[in-house]
Structures are given as structure tokens and as C-alpha cells.
Amino acid sequence: MNLYDLRRTHFSSKTVDTLQKVSKLLPKDAIFVNIGAYMESSTACILYGRPDIVAYSIDIEQCQDGLDNLEKLGLSAVRLLGTSQDHGRKWDSEIDMVYIDGDHSYESVKEDIELWVPWVKKNGFIAFHDYGTPHTPGVAKAIDEFVEEYGYPLFLKDGWDEEDVLRIYRVG
């Protein structure tokens, strides 16, 4: 199995490449938090070729296929079971990148932003998945409000068809 095998499950090759670009910009021993781990595709993209990065994967239940994906690639992450909000309320250290792809309701995305964005270091990254997908309108609304409130510039985006699925912002 290689990293691009993941695209056949959840990610396009463009998404894999985009996350790999950002991974290379993270500092040595970076802290990465993945909200909504499921198949661990985003975690794998960030960790692949960067064994120094410490990854925390948050999800409400254990997905054995996701753990198997990481193991097959020789990667590992600290798995935190429960909601991102529960873990966010207890979190107490800075992070270099947060990837928000958990509960796709407007309220949950907004709460993830409120709980996790303050922990992102200057020059760190905030990534959102499923922006612009018709079945998750709350995601785009929460992200648009985030951009208006914080003013962080769009760093990278990608998508398929007419949808801008992945949006990454850099903390100024």
C-alpha cells in the first residue's frame, strides 16, 4: 500500500498532494490534530514522509480500517475517542495544524473553530474538509464566518467538479 491508494477510498490525488505540500511546511516535531479521523486518510497524508510529526486523531468511535491504513503505511497516531468538543475543552497546548472534518453540522463546525483555532501557533495551519459540498451546507457557512471573523488568508484549496472541498488557512 502506498499513500495514493488512499485516494481510492476518500481522497482525490489532488487532495493527497495538497496535504503533502502543507506537511512539508510544518516545523520539525510539529503537532497535528485531526478532527474526524475515520479512515485516517488526512492523518496519513500529513505523516507520510514526516515521522517527526506527532499526530492526534479524534473520533467518536474506533475505526479498525483507519488504524489498519496507518499501520500498513508504517505510521501511527495518538487516537482520542470522544467528541472533538470534549477533547477541545480539555486541550492545553499549542498545535501546528488542525484539520476539521468531524460532525458536519453548522453548530459543531463553529464550536470546533472556537475550541481549536486559538491553539494554533502563528504560521500554523487550519484545514477544513467538505467545504462547498451540497450535503453539508453548514460547513461552508461556519468557515465563511470564520474567515470574516479572523481574517486569515486562504493558503490553499482544492476540490472536484465545482466543489472546493478542502480549504487551508494560515494563521498570521
Question: What are these model-derived regions, one by one?
Answer:
Residues 1-172:
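A short alpha-helical cap/connector motif
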